[in-house]
């Protein structure tokens, strides 16, 4: 409840959402505040404490795909002098875990911690296109919010887009969640069964020419990382 409320919750509001008494919600919140997991401001509204973020970072570091992808992505960031990111999809959200940015001929590693609807960004679409039918249906069957004029906010539009992504092997974002005039492209990282476990992307591309120039090396790095996870296109074609 607290994670879903950016403006925080009062004791009364939490009691209403949980369908419980104010005394019960007060005790729950007091315990969380005392343990350092929840913050309470001067207006007695409650918010998640940043400790949850540190726990999330530790959880992300346990993902094997990060250790495998990081050196490959660092190499391509240095070669092409363009920032890149690694993301996963959890539920209906794309969670950006790490990014690498060019810095004096090297690649600087940064931890990220923000989420975007899976259907409204390049990494999310790249992952969804190579996910199970059940995963795709869970997104397609939900209401799709239109964030910008470019957002694919109908089942038909998004279905066509995911099929295109699956055919070409990469996804493009031309301002579907936040239109700042730049583009992003992403490719899925596939496991031995051919299902996407993550995505890597180039972002901050300023024009169509830059976008098209960086798609081939991005596709290549996606194939290299996927092969490191056991994915092989020839085997996949045989076993389906």
Give the residues covered by each predicted segment.
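N-terminal helix-turn-helix
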Residues: 1-66, 226-231
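Short amphipathic alpha-helical signal-transduction/dimerization elements
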Residues: 3, 124, 128, 132, ...
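Charged catalytic carboxylate motif
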Residues: 24, 51, 68, 157, ...
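Short, ordered coil/turn segments that flank beta-strands lining enzyme active or ligand-binding pockets
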Residues: 42, 90, 192-193
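Amphipathic alpha-helical effector-binding/dimerization core
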Residues: 47-142
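Intrinsically disordered, low-complexity polar/acidic regions
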Residues: 147-148, 179
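Extended hydrophobic
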Residues: 154-228, 240
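Signal-transducing coiled-coil/dimerization helices and immediately adjacent hinge/linker segments
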Residues: 234-240
């Amino acid at each position: 409840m607290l994670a879903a409320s950016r403006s925080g919750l009062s004791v009364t509001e939490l009691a209403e959402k949980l369908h419980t008494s104010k005394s019960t919600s007060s005790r729950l919140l007091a315990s969380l505040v005392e343990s350092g997991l929840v913050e309470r401001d001067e207006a007695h509204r409650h918010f998640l404490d940043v400790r949850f973020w540190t726990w999330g970072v530790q959880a992300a570091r346990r993902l094997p795909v990060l250790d495998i992808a990081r050196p490959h992505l660092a190499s391509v960031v240095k070669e092409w002098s363009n920032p890149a990111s690694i993301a996963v999809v959890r539920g209906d959200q794309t969670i950006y875990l790490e990014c690498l940015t060019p810095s004096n001929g090297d690649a600087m590693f940064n931890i990220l911690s923000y989420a975007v609807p899976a259907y409204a960004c390049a990494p999310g679409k790249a992952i969804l296109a190579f996910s199970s039918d059940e995963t795709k249906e869970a997104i397609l069957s939900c209401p799709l919010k239109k964030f910008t004029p470019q957002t694919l906010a109908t089942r038909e539009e998004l279905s066509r887009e995911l099929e295109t992504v699956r055919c070409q092997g990469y996804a493009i974002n031309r301002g579907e969640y936040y239109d700042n005039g730049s583009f992003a492209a992403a490719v899925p990282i596939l496991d031995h069964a051919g299902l996407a476990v993550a995505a890597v992307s180039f972002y901050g591309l300023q024009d169509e020419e830059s976008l098209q120039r960086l798609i081939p090396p991005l596709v290549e790095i996606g194939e290299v990382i996927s092969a490191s996870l056991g994915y092989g296109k020839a085997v996949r074609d045989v076993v389906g």
